[in-house]
Amino acid sequence: MAYINKKFRLPQFTLGVEEEFQVIDPKTRELRSHMHQIVEGGKVILKEQVKAEMHQSVVEVGTNICKDVSEARKEVTYLRQMVAKLAHKQGLVIAAAGTHPFSRWQDQLITDHPRYEEIIREMQDAARSNLIFGLHVHIGIDDREIGIRLMN
Protein backbone atom coordinates (compact mmCIF):
# COMPACT_ATOMS: atom_id res chain seq x y z
CA MET A 1 0.00 0.00 0.00
CA ALA A 2 1.33 3.43 -0.91
CA TYR A 3 2.23 5.81 1.89
CA ILE A 4 0.46 9.15 1.74
CA ASN A 5 1.92 12.02 3.77
CA LYS A 6 -0.57 13.37 6.34
CA LYS A 7 -0.05 16.85 4.87
CA PHE A 8 -1.26 15.56 1.52
CA ARG A 9 -4.73 16.93 0.84
CA LEU A 10 -7.16 15.46 -1.61
CA PRO A 11 -7.19 17.66 -4.69
CA GLN A 12 -10.29 19.10 -6.28
CA PHE A 13 -10.80 17.54 -9.68
CA THR A 14 -12.96 17.63 -12.76
CA LEU A 15 -13.32 15.04 -15.47
CA GLY A 16 -14.51 14.61 -19.00
CA VAL A 17 -15.08 11.53 -21.12
CA GLU A 18 -14.73 11.10 -24.89
CA GLU A 19 -15.91 7.98 -26.73
CA GLU A 20 -15.32 7.01 -30.33
CA PHE A 21 -17.92 4.74 -31.90
CA GLN A 22 -17.92 2.58 -34.99
CA VAL A 23 -20.54 3.53 -37.58
CA ILE A 24 -21.88 0.22 -38.90
CA ASP A 25 -24.23 -1.04 -41.59
CA PRO A 26 -26.76 -3.19 -39.68
CA LYS A 27 -27.07 -5.72 -42.53
CA THR A 28 -23.46 -6.32 -43.54
CA ARG A 29 -21.90 -5.31 -40.19
CA GLU A 30 -19.21 -3.47 -42.21
CA LEU A 31 -18.00 -0.04 -41.20
CA ARG A 32 -19.76 2.73 -43.11
CA SER A 33 -18.25 6.11 -43.90
CA HIS A 34 -21.42 8.02 -42.98
CA MET A 35 -20.36 9.84 -39.85
CA HIS A 36 -21.24 13.24 -41.33
CA GLN A 37 -24.99 12.53 -41.35
CA ILE A 38 -24.82 11.59 -37.67
CA VAL A 39 -22.66 14.59 -36.74
CA GLU A 40 -24.78 17.09 -38.68
CA GLY A 41 -27.99 15.64 -37.23
CA GLY A 42 -26.52 15.83 -33.76
CA LYS A 43 -25.26 19.44 -33.91
CA VAL A 44 -28.75 20.81 -33.17
CA ILE A 45 -29.13 18.77 -29.98
CA LEU A 46 -25.58 17.95 -28.90
CA LYS A 47 -23.78 21.00 -30.32
CA GLU A 48 -20.01 20.51 -29.92
CA GLN A 49 -20.44 17.27 -27.97
CA VAL A 50 -20.56 15.28 -31.22
CA LYS A 51 -17.58 15.45 -33.57
CA ALA A 52 -16.07 14.08 -36.72
CA GLU A 53 -12.91 12.01 -36.54
CA MET A 54 -10.21 11.30 -39.13
CA HIS A 55 -11.99 8.22 -40.51
CA GLN A 56 -15.55 8.86 -41.64
CA SER A 57 -16.63 5.57 -40.07
CA VAL A 58 -15.92 6.98 -36.59
CA VAL A 59 -18.16 9.32 -34.61
CA GLU A 60 -16.94 10.88 -31.37
CA VAL A 61 -18.96 12.21 -28.46
CA GLY A 62 -17.64 14.00 -25.42
CA THR A 63 -19.08 15.11 -22.11
CA ASN A 64 -18.87 18.61 -20.78
CA ILE A 65 -16.44 19.18 -17.92
CA CYS A 66 -18.02 17.26 -15.04
CA LYS A 67 -17.62 17.89 -11.32
CA ASP A 68 -17.77 14.22 -10.33
CA VAL A 69 -18.10 10.66 -11.61
CA SER A 70 -21.87 10.61 -11.11
CA GLU A 71 -22.33 13.61 -13.40
CA ALA A 72 -19.97 12.10 -15.99
CA ARG A 73 -21.89 8.80 -15.91
CA LYS A 74 -25.19 10.60 -16.57
CA GLU A 75 -23.71 12.53 -19.49
CA VAL A 76 -22.04 9.45 -21.00
CA THR A 77 -25.33 7.52 -20.79
CA TYR A 78 -27.22 10.38 -22.44
CA LEU A 79 -24.62 10.80 -25.21
CA ARG A 80 -24.62 7.07 -25.98
CA GLN A 81 -28.40 7.07 -26.27
CA MET A 82 -28.45 10.14 -28.48
CA VAL A 83 -25.73 9.00 -30.89
CA ALA A 84 -27.46 5.61 -31.20
CA LYS A 85 -30.73 7.38 -32.07
CA LEU A 86 -28.99 9.64 -34.59
CA ALA A 87 -27.38 6.62 -36.26
CA HIS A 88 -30.70 4.76 -36.30
CA LYS A 89 -32.32 7.68 -38.15
CA GLN A 90 -29.72 7.14 -40.90
CA GLY A 91 -30.34 3.37 -41.03
CA LEU A 92 -27.07 2.70 -39.21
CA VAL A 93 -25.97 1.38 -35.84
CA ILE A 94 -23.02 2.20 -33.62
CA ALA A 95 -20.71 -0.09 -31.72
CA ALA A 96 -18.00 0.39 -29.12
CA ALA A 97 -14.90 -1.76 -29.54
CA GLY A 98 -11.18 -1.18 -29.88
CA THR A 99 -11.16 -1.99 -33.58
CA HIS A 100 -13.43 -3.55 -36.19
CA PRO A 101 -12.95 -7.30 -36.70
CA PHE A 102 -13.13 -7.41 -40.50
CA SER A 103 -13.64 -4.04 -42.21
CA ARG A 104 -10.59 -3.07 -44.24
CA TRP A 105 -8.86 0.18 -43.35
CA GLN A 106 -8.17 0.71 -47.08
CA ASP A 107 -11.93 1.07 -47.66
CA GLN A 108 -12.44 3.84 -45.10
CA LEU A 109 -12.87 7.41 -46.28
CA ILE A 110 -10.87 10.18 -44.62
CA THR A 111 -12.64 13.29 -43.32
CA ASP A 112 -11.93 16.41 -45.37
CA HIS A 113 -10.15 18.59 -42.81
CA PRO A 114 -6.74 20.34 -42.98
CA ARG A 115 -5.51 18.66 -39.79
CA TYR A 116 -6.34 15.18 -41.06
CA GLU A 117 -4.91 15.95 -44.50
CA GLU A 118 -1.62 16.97 -42.86
CA ILE A 119 -1.54 13.81 -40.74
CA ILE A 120 -2.17 11.64 -43.82
CA ARG A 121 0.47 13.53 -45.84
CA GLU A 122 3.08 13.05 -43.10
CA MET A 123 2.20 9.56 -41.84
CA GLN A 124 0.56 8.05 -44.97
CA ASP A 125 -0.53 4.41 -44.47
CA ALA A 126 0.50 4.46 -40.81
CA ALA A 127 -2.27 7.02 -40.23
CA ARG A 128 -4.79 5.53 -42.68
CA SER A 129 -4.45 2.09 -41.10
CA ASN A 130 -4.84 3.41 -37.56
CA LEU A 131 -8.50 2.40 -37.46
CA ILE A 132 -9.05 2.33 -33.72
CA PHE A 133 -11.86 3.44 -31.45
CA GLY A 134 -11.15 4.69 -27.96
CA LEU A 135 -12.58 5.85 -24.70
CA HIS A 136 -10.62 8.69 -23.13
CA VAL A 137 -11.04 9.97 -19.59
CA HIS A 138 -9.54 13.40 -18.97
CA ILE A 139 -8.88 14.44 -15.38
CA GLY A 140 -8.31 18.04 -14.33
CA ILE A 141 -6.62 18.59 -10.97
CA ASP A 142 -6.49 21.99 -9.28
CA ASP A 143 -2.95 21.59 -7.94
CA ARG A 144 -0.18 20.85 -10.47
CA GLU A 145 2.21 19.48 -7.83
CA ILE A 146 -0.37 17.03 -6.53
CA GLY A 147 -1.19 16.11 -10.13
CA ILE A 148 2.44 15.17 -10.77
CA ARG A 149 2.55 13.13 -7.56
CA LEU A 150 -0.59 11.28 -8.57
CA MET A 151 0.81 10.55 -12.02
CA ASN A 152 4.00 9.18 -10.49
Q: What does each model-found stretch correspond to?
A:
Residues 1-126, 131-133:
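Terminal catalytic/cofactor-binding subdomain
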Residues 137:
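An acidic/histidine-cluster motif and surrounding catalytic segment
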Residues 140:
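Histidine/acidic-residue-rich, glycine-tolerant segments that coordinate divalent metal ions
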